[in-house]
């Protein structure tokens, strides 16, 4: 049986880490792309040379897109992971990256449209939900085949902080985060539990509030430690979980940025935009979107997140008017 093909656009810390995780989990041949000459080739070779110890028999190869014709090597990809873009620095929000990253996403989108429009696409470049929207608008790819990182990573952080506070295994913590992948994300307390026991029965409100706040600013906490660059290990494995569910058709339910339309638009109060909600991920991409009910106070938080995503998506529309693709 032919191996799957996974292309990773961007060979920085996140892209290279994703490539390594994809290889070690033997999800398919990995094609690594970057605009800087030598970086994707060197990192791909480095990952390939670790194969004897990890035991993976697959190809990891790199291509520099300073020669744009090298994008043709992503043709026929089962999954494309888009990590290309500027990294956050201390004091920056994900939204501050918009101007730089939308230009990069525009170039990537046109090449996806040209060489591999039928791939499932995972958008990681920040702000991920907004860049997913830009990519879909420019590439014309079926939005069901596009999902953005956000809730997968934010939920992993939320679960980690809860597990550490309670001194329990992370495997027994069920919790998720919805909304935009920014400071207005919504960690959902009411659906959070440990082995089925509601979090609110295990922790006092002030502890929960502190964990929610830390989750919202979890990425910034790491940026402040690193000074230059942002998180990549937790994003890398969060992305890999999404890709694995596509490649193996696992039907995992993971909160991710998905395109909201139809009956879901009426429920969530946002239409034809990407925002983080619980979705089922399989070989066809976003195979189902789950509507969750809100209590009044939860709805207010959700509406704030929606407003933030709507405003940033409008920036994409305005940018596209000035820069027709």
UniProtKB/Swiss-Prot annotation:
Listed EC numbers: 1.1.1.37
Binding-site residues, substrate: 88, 94, 126, 157
GO biological process assignments: lactate metabolic process; tricarboxylic acid cycle
InterPro entries, sorted: L-lactate/malate_DH (IPR001557), Lactate/malate_DH_C (IPR022383), Lactate/malate_DH_N (IPR001236), Lactate_DH/Glyco_Ohase_4_C (IPR015955), Malate_DH_type3 (IPR011275), NAD(P)-bd_dom_sf (IPR036291)
GO terms assigned for molecular function: L-lactate dehydrogenase activity; L-malate dehydrogenase (NAD+) activity
Keywords: NAD, Oxidoreductase, Tricarboxylic acid cycle
Catalytic site positions: 181
Catalytic activity: (S)-malate + NAD(+) = oxaloacetate + NADH + H(+)
Binding site for NAD(+): 10-15, 34, 101, 124-126
Cited Gene3D superfamilies: Lactate dehydrogenase/glycoside hydrolase, family 4, C-terminal, NAD(P)-binding Rossmann-like Domain
CDD domains per UniProt: LDH-like_MDH
Function: Catalyzes the reversible oxidation of malate to oxaloacetate.
Family: Belongs to the LDH/MDH superfamily.
Protein name as catalogued: Malate dehydrogenase
Record organism: Thermoplasma volcanium (strain ATCC 51530 / DSM 4299 / JCM 9571 / NBRC 15438 / GSS1)
Name of the gene: mdh
């Amino acid at each position: 049986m032919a191996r799957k093909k996974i292309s990773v656009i961007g060979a920085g810390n996140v892209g290279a880490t994703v490539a390594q995780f994809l290889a070690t989990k033997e999800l398919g041949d990995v094609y690594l792309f970057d605009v800087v000459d030598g970086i994707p080739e060197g990192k791909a070779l480095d990952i390939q040379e670790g194969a004897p110890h990890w035991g993976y028999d697959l190809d990891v190869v790199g291509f520099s897109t300073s020669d744009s014709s090298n994008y043709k090597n992503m043709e026929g990809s089962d999954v494309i992971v888009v990590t290309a873009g500027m990294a956050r620095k201390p004091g920056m929000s994900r939204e501050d990256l918009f101007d730089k990253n939308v230009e990069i996403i525009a170039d990537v989108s046109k090449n996806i449209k040209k060489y591999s429009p039928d791939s499932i696409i995972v958008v990681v470049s920040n702000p991920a939900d907004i860049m997913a929207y830009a990519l879909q608008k420019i590439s014309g790819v079926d939005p069901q085949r596009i999902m953005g990182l956000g809730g997968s990573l934010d939920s992993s952080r939320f679960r980690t902080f809860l597990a550490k506070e309670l001194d329990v295994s992370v495997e027994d913590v069920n919790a998720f985060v919805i909304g935009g992948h920014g400071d207005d994300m919504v960690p959902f307390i009411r659906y959070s539990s440990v082995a089925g026991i509601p979090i609110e029965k295990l922790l006092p409100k002030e502890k929960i509030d502190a964990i929610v706040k830390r989750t919202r600013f979890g990425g910034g906490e790491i940026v402040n430690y690193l000074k230059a660059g942002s998180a990549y290990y937790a994003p890398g494995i969060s992305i890999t979980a999404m890709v694995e569910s596509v490649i193996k058709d696992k039907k995992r339910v993971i909160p991710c940025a998905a395109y909201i339309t139809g009956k879901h638009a009426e429920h969530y109060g946002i239409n034809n935009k990407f925002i983080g909600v619980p979705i089922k991920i399989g070989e066809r991409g976003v195979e189902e979107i789950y509507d969750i009910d809100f209590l009044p106070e939860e709805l207010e938080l959700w509406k704030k997140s929606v407003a933030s995503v709507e405003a940033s998506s409008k920036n994409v529309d305005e940018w596209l008017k000035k820069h027709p693709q």
